Regions:
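Conserved N-terminal beta1-alpha1 strand-loop-helix module at the mouth
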Residues: 1-48
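Conserved, mostly hydrophobic/aromatic
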Residues: 18, 46, 112, 199, ...
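Catalytic cores of alpha/beta
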Residues: 101-114, 191-195, 220-223, 243-249, ...
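Active-site pocket-lining/capping segments in soluble small-molecule metabolic enzymes
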Residues: 125, 138-171, 176-185, 192, ...
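Active-site mouth loops of central-metabolism enzymes
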Residues: 14-32, 90-103, 173-191, 267-281
């Protein structure tokens, strides 16, 4: 069943979360333990992130350096299959423009098709660490709309080179990202919503938001996208606040605001455990208000926050 159908057919606000593939050279057991911690809350689906390759430089000892490419977290497709097979939970691998050519993406789609994994989250992805602005790979999609169009062509039975796909399979369905506080590269919110609508017109069936800590921004964003004629589910993305250092790290990394009330209370905390408890309580209140307003699902970003999410879920699910 597709993600959008899972959301529609649950009799309560759906629960889902995102995980990262293990670091290269490590095992999957830690990831399984995280899922085991949260599986009792009946996740409707689990997202698996994808990570682009980065350039690294190795000193050769003669004053010269050798450049090579390294993916620190490979294995998204395999992890998605492993989770699905072990837990019988729908998995949603992320598909990126960033770091991938159209041919690379096509091979990923073929692998997923063989595994009967047909739900995707379609994203542009972050720029490389050495870049000041995003640069697509050679013969790679420049933004999520182009990536969605490639997936549409694949669903219609056409490879990147124009040759036909001779086998008919279940078509991919996909969601996209959206930003209640605007994508950092968008000149204004209206332009950001314009591109979201284009992705919906291309075939996106739902959108998951960037994390936020002020529900008013989510509600205002939903009003704006509805006014623009966008009627797909807008799923709030949530991550419990955990550390005082996040007062600066979160705005810098995710380009979102921390509400003054939360910031002031966090500064009063004298221990990490106290700060973590504050974040859990804040998240519980956020989720209760979102559920009261009838959100279709709540999607949790679990990295470094599994135990906090468990405490939140115990109250709201």
């Amino acid at each position: 069943m597709k993600v959008v159908d899972l959301i529609k057919h649950t009799n309560k606000t759906a629960f889902s979360f995102e995980v990262l593939p293990p670091l290269k050279g490590t095992g999957i057991e830690k990831l399984y333990r995280s899922i085991d911690t949260l599986r009792d809350f009946d996740p409707q689906y689990i997202n698996i992130t994808t990570h682009r390759s980065e350039y690294v430089y190795k000193e050769l000892g003669n004053g010269l350096f050798e450049r090579s490419r390294l993916r620190r977290r490979p294995g998204t497709v395999a992890v998605a299959a492993a989770i699905h097979n072990k837990y019988n939970i729908t998995t949603v691998p992320h598909i990126l423009c960033s770091g991938f050519s159209r041919e690379d993406i096509e091979y990923v789609l073929l692998d997923l098709q063989f595994l009967n994994i047909t739900d995707l989250l379609v994203l542009r992805g972050d720029k490389a660490k050495h870049e000041s602005t995003f640069t697509p790979e050679e013969n790679g999609p420049a933004h999520a709309l182009e990536l969605a169009e490639q997936i549409n062509d694949f669903n219609r039975g056409v490879f990147v080179d124009g040759s036909p796909i001779k086998v008919t399979n279940t078509p991919f369905s996909y969601g996209v990202a959206c930003y209640p506080e605007k994508h950092e590269e968008a000149p204004n919110m209206e332009q950001d919503i314009y591109w979201l609508k284009k992705k919906v017109e291309a075939g996106a069936e739902y959108a998951v938001t960037q994390l936020f800590y002020d529900n008013r921004k989510y509600f205002q964003f939903v009003e704006k996208v509805r006014a623009a004629g966008i009627n797909i589910p807008i799923i709030p993305g949530i991550k419990p606040f955990r550390k005082q250092s996040q007062l600066s790290v979160i705005p810098k990394t995710f380009k979102v605001d921390i509400p003054q009330e939360l910031a002031l209370e966090a500064l009063k905390c004298t221990t990490e455990k106290e700060t973590e408890r504050l974040g859990i309580e804040w998240c519980i209140q956020q989720c209760k208000e979102l559920i009261k307003h009838g959100v279709p699902s709540i999607h949790f970003y679990s990295v470094g926050a599994v135990e906090s999410i468990k405490e939140v879920a115990k109250v709201i699910y």
